[in-house]
């Protein structure tokens, strides 16, 4: 077989990777940086062209893979995500904010102007949408990495699987399955602790139940989650508002959790639209 002359040899193009954020805390981006040695091991196989947390490089595309953190909460963000989608081959949302709206989506149940007046001294200068929504409400999403923050193990699996050309193995079982594997006693049955494990997607390693606390639903509802069924069981001996409060956290705006909250009349607490007064007339 004839050898290819050096002048004619070709090197496969490294995939162009971007990481961007919208309304979020940056925690999921930091999870990517926390991979440290694992990230360095594959760095020469990637071309990171946009990642404000890690590099001064800037790019508006095109991207082979774009990781998106954060919910869409402003008119500018709604425009930007459409532009980024058009410049991206594979768009991956990372974290509860991007996949379900995040903790800030609790404001979706309240009066928009009332919330702005409560938070900002001069709300007329703040442009925001009436709702904070997941990226998938605005553009097509190719893959989701859930969690608050995301799991470094799942992130590592996604990146390595994508580079190897295989489908990532991202489980959709309940947190309860992780408790069984770790021999963690069910806190809901044994201790009467409120736990969203039966309806929450696995990925955390049953972290909270392992320390005797109920699952807070950080990874959002699993595909076949029966939120209403769990709410009925939890609500046997407690006020419906307390049950709704259990679902009104990081993934409150996800449909299975939202239905439970809606049935209770909205999320209780200080962000509740019933407890925020209308802004006073100037």
Regions flagged by a language model, labelled:
Residues 92-94:
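Active-site neighborhood of phospho(di)ester-bond hydrolases with catalytic His/Asp-centered motifs
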């Amino acid at each position: 077989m004839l050898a290819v002359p050096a002048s004619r040899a070709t090197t496969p193009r490294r995939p162009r990777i971007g990481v961007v954020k919208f309304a979020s805390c940056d925690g999921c981006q930091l999870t990517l940086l926390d991979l440290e040695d694992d990230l360095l091991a594959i760095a020469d196989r990637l071309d990171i062209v946009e990642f404000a947390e890690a590099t001064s490089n800037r790019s508006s595309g095109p991207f082979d893979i774009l990781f998106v953190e954060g919910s869409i909460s402003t008119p500018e963000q709604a425009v930007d995500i459409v532009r980024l989608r058009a410049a991206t081959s594979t768009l991956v949302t990372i974290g509860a904010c991007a996949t379900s709206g995040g903790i800030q989506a609790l404001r979706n149940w309240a009066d928009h102007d009332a919330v702005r007046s409560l938070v900002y001294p001069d709300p007329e200068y703040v442009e925001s949408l009436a709702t904070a929504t997941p990226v998938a409400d605005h553009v097509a999403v190719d893959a989701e990495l859930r969690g608050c923050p995301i799991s470094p193990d799942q992130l590592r699996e996604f990146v390595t699987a994508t580079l190897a050309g295989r489908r990532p193995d991202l489980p959709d079982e309940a947190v309860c399955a992780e408790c069984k594997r770790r021999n963690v006693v069910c806190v809901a049955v044994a201790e009467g602790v409120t736990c969203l494990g039966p309806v929450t997607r696995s990925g955390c390693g049953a972290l909270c139940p392992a320390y005797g606390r109920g699952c807070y639903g950080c990874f959002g509802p699993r595909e076949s989650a029966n939120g209403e069924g769990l709410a009925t069981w939890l609500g046997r001996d407690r006020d419906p508002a307390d049950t709704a409060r259990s679902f009104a956290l990081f993934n409150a705006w996800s449909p299975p959790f939202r239905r439970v909250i809606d049935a209770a009349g909205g999320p209780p607490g200080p962000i509740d639209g019933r407890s925020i007064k209308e802004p006073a007339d100037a």
